[in-house]
């Protein structure tokens, strides 16, 4: 038994080498497509296996299990689930712009339903798929050994059409990713032919032909042309895609909105669920109901709250809050013809494809030319055999080694003699000189054409262009599959903020929030609140008079702001609902609740003695998680949020020192810790108040309001310590 060999290797070096090997394997052999055929290895192996099984468009279907078995057994030694998922996606008309596989059976749905098991489904190639492998048997591409050296597989596909851009691709590798949306094949062919005629064309010229992505699910791209062009110039960007909808008139002036197309890669079922949740949470008050009436075509019916609602505004609110508008990323990170990953722009991708087609046609022409030369040589031998038929038959019958004798007697090559000897005697007798001459002449014409293609670059590019033109004619705009599905619109309402409060009846309400964070609203103002009940151990903390159309600001002890629509607060005589169900406030306390007023100033203060002024427009939160405005250190809290309605500020803390200074000394900020309001030593700020100096400083003491007009003794600069408060000031060091 041999002794095991142990080497001392630096762990860091070994780890980095192995990780690099893994990363390269992921990038080159799994996640990124090749710019030439737009396929990843698993796609290439799957389609080649189907070609070997002769699953052509005009043949019968075969079980997907058989296809997957061949793929993982011969070419792709990975899990059957991954291969079947790939097969399913290539057959889904809502995933691929030009499906490469024709599936029979349940291949999933746009709702996100899974496909049936592979033992139930069947498949074959589509017509456009055969273009990817056209002429693969004519030495157009290199082959390599499979993983077990038992067979060969193509390194690349001949690809008669630009599959990378036509069908797009997406994948995540180690440290890089790719995301290429699908495009219209007719437009791509126009761009390629223009590039052949004008090799020095720039991206701006190409954009005259390629308008933008063309998604299998349709939709409307609302980006401006300069934004789209910029994305294609850099190879990175994104496209904003909206659902297509129409207004459907009903009786008595009532209407409904019908969505007929949804953005690419948006699952219909999840979209409906998303809208339903917003309806339940009263986030879209302009909508009363949504229902799915889809069959083979998409039909989502949205009912407005009432017929006076502008359908454009209804849809704007839905676009803002749901996936009816989504952003499709563009990241053209692909493996180039030099086997190096690179983010390419649209021009580079098209040039790479044309170079690939140039190489394919060159190799095909060379292959066919060699075949013709071989056949011409044989025909020349057959013509000699025809002219000397009796003598050749005699040699074949009588001589033991007819090959050498025939080569010497008639000056024939070995190939010619082999062809004659391999021809059956009956066939030799039926040889006709005219047939040989006709075939010889035709082959010479073909030979001249092929030699012209190989020797004249202009002729070669003519062939490339002719074949692209043929693809365009077969799958262009005038065909069912080729017509553009995604359109473009300039949306003027994109940046408009939809004021949903305009559709809420304005009614007075009183908002009540308890110490334990239970919130509710009662109709009207000036209510008698003596009969209000709270949970055991709870009591009132905030009482706020507002209107149903108001937006309510909730400030937490950690300095985070939350925004609620007053109409969404629980109504009735119960204990209400926990604030935690409405906003993600966590275990923090509520510092203040205010009615939002546009362009009003608010003063924020923390227990550490710092604060700043902020505009109310800056604190509006758009999400349930809120917006962090005041940064509070550990061990401290945000103690106050006050409307700025005076010229002076009074501060008092645990040190029982009162400081009064001008409010103009506090800067206005958007967020942060703020500046020092009052200096403390081993103490905290407890309370703060804004007032007008000429009115005097007031506070509550023993249920009575006391007023101090003479506050000169307490005046100081912001950041000072302050002085002891006047006699009778509350012992809890608070103004109220």
From Swiss-Prot:
PROSITE patterns: TOPO_IIA. Keywords: Cell membrane, DNA-binding, Isomerase, Membrane, Topoisomerase. GO terms for cellular component: chromosome; cytoplasm; DNA topoisomerase type II (double strand cut, ATP-hydrolyzing) complex; extrinsic component of plasma membrane. Signal peptide: none annotated. It is an enzyme of class 5 (isomerase). It is found in: Cell membrane. One of its GO terms (biological process) is chromosome segregation. Residues 32-496 form the Topo IIA-type catalytic domain. The keyword Transferase does not apply. It catalyses: ATP-dependent breakage, passage and rejoining of double-stranded DNA. The active site is at 120 (o-(5'-phospho-dna)-tyrosine intermediate). It is a peripheral membrane protein. Topoisomerase IV is essential for chromosome segregation. It relaxes supercoiled DNA. Performs the decatenation events required during the replication of a circular DNA molecule. This is DNA topoisomerase 4 subunit A. It comes from Rickettsia bellii (strain RML369-C). The gene is parC.
């Amino acid at each position: 038994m041999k002794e095991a060999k142990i080497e001392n290797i630096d762990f860091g070096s070994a780890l980095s080498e192995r990780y690099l090997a893994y990363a390269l394997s992921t990038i080159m052999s799994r996640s990124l497509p090749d710019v030439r055929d737009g396929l990843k290895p698993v796609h290439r192996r799957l389609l080649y296996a189907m070609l070997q099984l002769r699953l052509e468009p005009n043949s019968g279907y075969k079980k997907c299990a058989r296809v997957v078995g061949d793929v993982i057994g011969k070419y792709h030694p990975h899990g059957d689930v991954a291969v079947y998922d790939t097969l399913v996606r290539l057959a889904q008309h809502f995933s691929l712009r030009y499906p490469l596989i024709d599936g029979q059976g349940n291949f999933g749905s746009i709702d996100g339903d899974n496909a049936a098991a592979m033992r139930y489904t069947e498949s074959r190639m589509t017509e456009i798929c055969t273009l990817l492998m056209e002429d693969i048997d004519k030495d157009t591409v290199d082959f390599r050994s499979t993983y077990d050296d038992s067979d060969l597989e193509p390194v690349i596909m001949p690809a008669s059409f630009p599959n990378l851009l036509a069908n797009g691709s997406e994948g995540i590798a180690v440290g890089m990713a790719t995301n290429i949306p699908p495009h219209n094949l007719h437009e791509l062919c126009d761009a390629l032919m223009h590039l052949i005629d004008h090799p020095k064309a720039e991206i701006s010229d190409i954009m005259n032909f390629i308008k933008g992505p063309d998604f299998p699910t349709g939709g409307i791209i609302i980006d401006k042309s300069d934004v789209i062009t910029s994305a294609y110039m850099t190879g990175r960007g994104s496209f904003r895609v909206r659902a297509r909808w129409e207004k459907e008139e009903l009786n008595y002036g009532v209407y409904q909105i019908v969505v007929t197309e949804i953005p690419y890669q948006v699952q219909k079922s999840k979209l409906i669920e998303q809208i339903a949740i917003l309806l339940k949470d009263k986030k879209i008050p302009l909508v009363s109901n949504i229902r799915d009436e889809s069959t083979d075509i998409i039909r989502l019916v949205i009912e407005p709250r009432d017929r006076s609602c502008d359908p454009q505004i209804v849809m704007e609110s839905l676009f803002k809050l749901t996936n009816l508008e989504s952003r499709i990323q563009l990241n053209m990170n692909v493996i180039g013809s030099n086997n190096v990953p690179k983010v390419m722009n649209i021009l580079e991708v098209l040039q790479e494809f044309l170079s690939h087609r140039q190489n394919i046609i060159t190799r095909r022409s060379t292959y066919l030319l060699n075949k013709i030369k071989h056949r011409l040589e044989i025909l020349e031998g057959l013509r000699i055999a025809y002219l000397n038929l009796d003598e050749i038959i005699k040699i074949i019958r009588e001589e033991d080694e007819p090959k050498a004798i025939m080569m010497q007697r008639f000056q024939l090559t070995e190939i010619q003699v082999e062809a004659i000897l391999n021809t059956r005697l009956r066939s030799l007798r039926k040889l006709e000189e005219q047939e040989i001459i006709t075939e010889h002449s035709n082959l010479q014409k073909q030979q001249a054409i092929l030699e012209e293609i190989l020797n004249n670059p202009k002729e070669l590019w003519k062939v490339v262009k002719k074949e692209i033109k043929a693809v365009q004619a077969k799958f262009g705009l005038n065909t069912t599959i080729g017509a553009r599905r995604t359109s473009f619109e300039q949306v003027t309402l994109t940046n408009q903020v939809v004021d949903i409060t305009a559709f809420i009846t304005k009614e007075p309400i009183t908002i009540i929030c308890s110490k334990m964070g239970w919130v509710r609203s009662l109709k009207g103002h000036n209510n008698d609140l003596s009969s209000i009940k709270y949970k055991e151990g709870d009591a009132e903390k905030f009482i706020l008079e507002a209107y149903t159309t108001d937006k309510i600001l909730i400030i937490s002890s950690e300095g985070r702001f939350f925004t609620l629509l007053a109409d969404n607060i629980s109504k009735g005589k119960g204990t209400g609902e926990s604030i935690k169900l409405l906003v993600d406030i966590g275990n923090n306390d509520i510092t203040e609740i205010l009615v939002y007023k546009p362009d009003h100033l608010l003063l924020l203060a923390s227990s550490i003695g710092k604060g700043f002024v902020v505009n109310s427009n800056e604190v509006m939160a758009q999400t349930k998680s809120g917006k962090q405005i005041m940064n509070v250190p550990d061990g401290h809290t945000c103690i106050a949020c006050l409307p700025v309605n005076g010229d002076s500020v009074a501060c008092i803390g645990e040190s029982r020192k009162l400081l009064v200074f001008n409010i103009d000394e506090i800067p206005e900020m958007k967020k942060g810790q703020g500046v020092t309001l009052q200096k403390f030593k081993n103490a905290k700020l407890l309370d703060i108040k804004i007032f007008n100096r000429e009115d005097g400083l007031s506070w509550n003491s023993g249920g009575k309001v006391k007023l101090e007009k003479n506050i000169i003794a307490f005046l100081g600069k912001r950041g000072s310590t302050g002085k002891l408060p006047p006699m009778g000031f509350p012992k809890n060091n608070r103004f109220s």
